Amino acid sequence: MKTLRATIKGVGHYLPERVIENAEFEKTLDTTDDWIKSRSGIERRHFAAEGELTSHLAVKAAQNALTDAGLTIDQIDAIILATSTPDQTFPATATKVQAALGMQRGFAFDVQAVCAGFVFALANANAMILSGQARRVIVIGAETFSRIMDWTDRSTCVLFGDGAGAVVLEATETDGASSDRGILSTDLHSDGRFSDLLYVDGGVSSTQTAGVLKMEGREVFKHAVIKLAQTADAAMEKAGVTADQVDWVVPHQANLRIIKSTAQKMGVPIERVVLTVQDHGNTSAASIPLALSVGKARGQIKRGDLLVAEAIGGGLAWGAVVLRW
């Protein structure tokens, strides 16, 4: 008996042209390149140009993913966009992406789970494919976090960047074995008791302003390592695989120390972790699809590889996906 799986058909990304090296922050903040690198592993990040919106980044990443998949937009049933930095309060930025891509069928909507957004969006797309709601789905993570930074706060503004990544998921019949391609499991969590650890101090119904990012870095670090390892372990158990079988861990690229500590807790050597944080900074929901696309382009991620993607973000919200590339 055949089993339906949501398989990765294509992947792509887009990074804004403007690159900000750590040294630039030395001009306006009490910080140094060494200080930033030692605490985060970040060396540079990309910032969107004036007038360059989240939807613009998302469209370019989606186009690259479609090209990689060998598909046209007319063959897509749905678009799910993970973002915390939408173009407008409404409509959903995904519908602007839908229009820009020339898609006149199906449906498009946004998912907001901050840095965990892409994992949540991927789980949504997987469920829609398995239920027959859609056959092919573009899942995008796109962010312009440079628009919500407090440029006087050296503990946060040096950490984030802008960018977008996308994958095309396609329904595929398989034998249902863990060796078959596709999403093998998902694991999602949130706990609103910790919402004050990472948030933006603005909103439509509260302040009528966009606000700026606020973070209790040390507390987030402690929660991140424990929760990321736990959700990765839970997803692997659901998939019937073990850490020693994993070819690549593709983590949310927030902080190199978090990434290393989580990998150690999972029992995965850092050599089997896809790292892009040094070049991108924390791109929130865009970080995992960016890492998937860059990892493939580098020749790290190959067809048949077993991957674990895990992320945590404001909410707190966290989760993991196990998939066979």
Locations of the language-model features?
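Flexible, glycine-rich active-site loops centered on histidine and acidic residues
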Residues: 130-163
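Acidic, glycine-rich active-site loops and adjacent beta-strand->loop/helix elements
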Residues: 13-14, 82-88, 113-118, 141-146, ...
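Catalytic phosphate/nucleotide-handling subdomain of diverse soluble enzymes
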Residues: 290-310, 318-325
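Buried hydrophobic positions in well-ordered alpha/beta secondary-structure cores of metabolic enzymes
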Residues: 8-10, 36, 65, 76-79, ...
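Active-site pocket-lining segment
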Residues: 220, 224-230, 243-266
